[in-house]
């Protein structure tokens, strides 16, 4: 894939010098991923993986005002909603192929450099957390906000969140808290900080520099980073104390009993989330902590299948969450159950039962 795709393409993939360059080109939707975009990114990465001329890959997002300013806001949740309601089989394809792409990035044999400027959420984290170099800026906003739509942190979220220090994985997964660039570095979700004003020059120079190896590309990018001299002040001891508790009910009770703004604000956020999915996410992150990436992605593929299946007598929490946030926009989801203490273990357990035998799992080939 040595030629640029047409400028109206949602993914522009081109080789510039000896670097494979990917631009997510859907700025009006904050580069939200469609199935076609996932397929285009995958095709480019596979072609470049086997092309000895290409030494490294760099990915960016197009902003509304031009290059950069937004990386990727996640998956196309309006598509999820419509596809779930009409039974569109492309919904199954979307998650299978997205998670396979996430695995491809994590295991890519050449340096894969993500320029994570602006919004980096959900699916945007999925195409950046596996990068060998994750560059953030002063404009970066990173999050896994899926509990806000009755979903869970997928795209490998259980895997990479559970590897954050202490119990930050549980905290970030349950709340969907948004991190700035420096915070993300402190928490192990980014590697380097760069002034956003330098990104265009970096991008242009990548295609003009006679690199000799992929490692040289990565080193060259690192030469543009800023030093992070300060650590973000976080109540890490409180996070660990509260989010290491055994259950969502215990976490909520501990927050209610803890004085201070952090506990009050965190409790207010959790009270807006799907009680069922809070229980599911806590279990997900803790299971994933002991899993490799491939197994964690297979688990998430099982989970997302259950999320979009309409439960007998109950609506899908995910369909309802998307309706409230992005379709009707009433911001009043009707969660079922409505309270944390109404969620029973038998409601959570089915999310972790695969609907496929191992030999037929859609991600069986991941290793």
Question: Can you describe what each PLM-predicted range is?
Answer:
Residues 131-154, 188-203:
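Gly/Pro- and small hydrophobic-enriched strand-loop and loop-to-helix capping segments
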């Amino acid at each position: 894939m040595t030629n640029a795709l047409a400028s109206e393409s949602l993914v522009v993939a081109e080789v510039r010098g000896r670097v494979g360059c990917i631009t997510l080109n859907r700025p009006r939707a904050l580069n939200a991923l469609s199935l076609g975009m996932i397929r285009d990114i995958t095709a480019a990465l596979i072609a470049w993986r086997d092309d000895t001329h290409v030494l490294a890959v760099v990915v960016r997002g197009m902003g509304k005002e031009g290059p950069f300013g937004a990386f990727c806001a996640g998956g196309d949740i309006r598509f999820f909603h419509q596809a779930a309601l009409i039974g569109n089989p492309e919904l199954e394809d979307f998650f299978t192929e997205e998670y396979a792409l996430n695995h491809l990035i994590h295991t890519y044999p050449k340096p894969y450099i993500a320029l994570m400027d602006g919004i980096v959420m959900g699916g945007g984290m999925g195409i950046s957390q596996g990068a060998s170099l994750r560059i953030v800026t002063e404009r970066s906003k990173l999050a896994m906000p899926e509990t806000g739509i009755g979903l869970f942190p997928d795209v490998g979220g259980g895997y990479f969140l559970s590897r954050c220090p202490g119990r930050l994985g549980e905290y970030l997964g349950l709340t969907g808290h948004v991190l700035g660039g420096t915070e993300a570095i402190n928490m192990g979700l980014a590697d380097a900080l760069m002034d956003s004003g330098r990104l265009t020059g970096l991008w242009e120079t990548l295609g003009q520099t006679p690199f000799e190896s992929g490692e040289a590309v990565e080193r060259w990018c690192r030469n543009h980073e800023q030093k992070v001299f300060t650590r973000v002040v976080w109540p890490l001891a409180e996070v660990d104390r509260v989010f290491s508790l055994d259950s969502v009910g215990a976490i909520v009770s501990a927050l209610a009993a803890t004085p201070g703004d952090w506990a009050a604000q965190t409790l207010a956020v959790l009270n807006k989330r799907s009680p069922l999915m809070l229980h599911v996410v806590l279990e997900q992150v803790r299971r994933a902590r002991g899993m490799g990436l491939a197994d964690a992605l297979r688990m998430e593929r099982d989970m997302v299948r259950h999320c979009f299946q309409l439960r007998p007598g109950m609506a899908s929490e995910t369909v309802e969450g998307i309706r409230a946030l992005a379709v009707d926009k009433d911001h009043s989801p009707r969660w079922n159950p409505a309270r944390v203490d109404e969620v029973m273990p038998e409601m959570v357990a089915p999310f972790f039962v695969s609907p496929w035998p191992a030999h037929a799992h859609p991600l069986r080939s991941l290793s």
